[in-house]
UniProtKB/Swiss-Prot annotation:
Keywords attached to this entry: Glycoprotein, Secreted, Signal
Compartments it resides in: Secreted
Protein family according to the UniProt entry: Belongs to the major royal jelly protein family.
Domain of life: Eukaryota
Protein name (record): Yellow-related salivary protein LJM17
Primary localization class, coarse: secreted
GO cellular component assignments: extracellular region
Span of the signal peptide: 1-18
Known tissue expression: Salivary gland.
Species: Lutzomyia longipalpis (Sand fly)
Pfam families noted in UniProt: MRJP
Glycosylation site positions: 29
Function text: Probably modulates blood feeding of sand flies on vertebrate species by binding and sequestering different mediators involved in the host response. Binds biogenic amines. Binds serotonin with high affinity. Binds noradrenaline but not adrenaline. Binds dopamine and octopamine. Binds histamine. Inhibits host smooth muscle contraction induced by histamine in bioassay with guinea pig ileum. Immunogenic; elicits antibody production in the host. Functions as a chemoattractant for host neutrophils; likely acts through a G-protein-coupled receptor and effect is dependent on calcium influx.
Length: 412
């Protein structure tokens, strides 16, 4: 029997600098059609990452198994059948439709899906659930594994799998975001590198798909330089401190190298390193500090818009999304807020899809140590939000556009 996610979706429009951010889906909890809610707890189904394939009209979310009875760790939505607006009915997520093939394993625990320039969907399956008891024994235990699926082919077959060696990480559950670097998009897509962040080890793991080999780098710039705050229920606050978390790739040069921009989750600084250095095992890194975005701008996720040369940041506690043009000096005066809402509770992921659409997601679930306290929180508004806006609209009316001219002030 095929089960479906069922949740209430609403559409709102938020005006920011003349642009509009569409709230396509907002959820209090995710439930599953065909399953009695007595058999599982819907509040444990918290998505942490998303990926969008506009060519195939598919949206993917990752739901890690941090609590028992999470039916699917990767799910998808048909955006033709469920565009998000107008609200005619509740859209239905499905289990990720893939063909494993003989001997292939199902996914155990995924935090982040990523689609590369060759329309391959990548996930890092960390290899174990994050609890004991309950249904934990029904899931196999293994190493963190990178897996790729071909979105261009029927049934989305698995086409690549690589286990991360034990000596490259200290814990399976502290991986952050990752990026896939296809060196030559007009050639063989297997000439690719994957850059995996680890916010506990403050390390960056590099996987060479051609050689099927991985290595890691550590650097002081990967470390947290402050303590982050998550504000909840008025004056109540929670603290957390995490290192390297978000990574985004800039424009390629003639040799196929590009800047890899990165942020620690507990920092407001932005750094980059040339991927030429990352592609060499035991190479020397020469990080570049671009600047500081200013107080209260901590973020765990960022995304690059190649059309407009802009980085976007899903901020963690400010409940807003900001931008910075990479051709400008990085300082607060050269950044801008393109979205702000009290209902945007903890930005967890952000991306620019292949059609130039900016997607952002909040889930109300920061990486604090006292996770049990998070699970017990009550939200007045729907905490899970997936929104989108055309980057052209955002760019045109923000300071991230070098030609932007603010409206004249009216003298009174």
């Amino acid at each position: 029997m095929r089960f479906f996610f069922v949740f209430l979706a609403i559409v709102l429009f938020q005006g920011i600098h003349g642009a509009y951010v569409e709230i396509g889906y907002s959820l209090r909890n995710i439930t599953f059609d065909g399953l009695d809610t007595d058999d599982y707890n819907p509040k444990f189904n918290i998505p942490t990452g998303l990926a969008v394939d506009p060519e195939g009209y598919r949206l993917f979310i990752a739901i890690p198994r941090r609590k028992p009875k999470v039916p699917y760790t990767v799910a998808e939505l048909n955006m033709v059948m469920n565009p998000g607006f107008p609200v005619e009915r509740a859209p239905s997520f499905e289990k990720f439709k893939k063909f494993n093939g003989e001997g292939k394993k199902d996914l155990v625990n995924v935090y982040q899906p990523v689609i590369d320039d060759c329309r391959r969907l990548w996930v890092l399956d960390i290899g174990k659930v994050e609890y004991t008891g309950g249904d934990a024994d029904q899931y196999p235990k293994g190493k963190p594994t990178l897996i790729a699926y071909d979105l261009k082919k029927d049934h989305t077959p698995e086409i690549h799998r690589f286990e991360i060696p034990d000596d490259l990480y200290s814990s399976q559950v502290e991986f952050g975001g990752f990026a896939v670097d296809v060196v030559n998009t007009k050639g063989d897509c297997t000439e690719s590198f994957v850059y995996l962040t680890n916010f506990k080890d403050n390390s960056l793991i590099v996987y060479d798909e051609t050689q099927k080999k991985a290595w890691k780098f550590t650097d002081k710039t990967f470390e947290a330089d402050k303590e982050s705050t998550f504000s909840y229920s008025g004056e109540e606050q929670m603290k957390y401190k995490v290192g390297l978390f978000g990574i985004a790739l800039g424009d390629r040069d003639e040799m196929g190298h590009r800047p890899a921009c990165y942020i620690a989750g507990s920092s407001t600084k932005v750094y980059s390193v040339n991927t030429k250095e990352l592609k060499t095992e035991n190479g020397q890194l020469n990080p570049q500090l671009h600047g500081d975005r200013g107080k209260y701008t901590d973020a765990i996720a960022l995304a690059y818009d190649p059309e407009h040369k802009v980085l976007y940041f899903a901020e963690s506690d400010s409940r807003q999304v900001s931008c910075w043009n990479v051709n400008m000096e990085l300082k607060p005066d050269n950044t801008d807020v393109i979205f702000s809402s009290a209902r945007f509770t903890f930005g967890t992921d952000i991306l620019v899809d292949s059609k130039g659409m900016l997607w952002i997601m909040a889930n109300g679930h920061p990486p604090v140590e006292d996770q049990e306290k998070i699970w017990k929180m009550r939200f007045v508004n729907r905490k899970i939000r997936i929104m989108k806006v055309d980057t052209e609209r955002v760019f045109k009316y923000s300071r991230c556009n070098p030609n932007y001219k603010p409206p004249k002030e009216i003298e009174v």
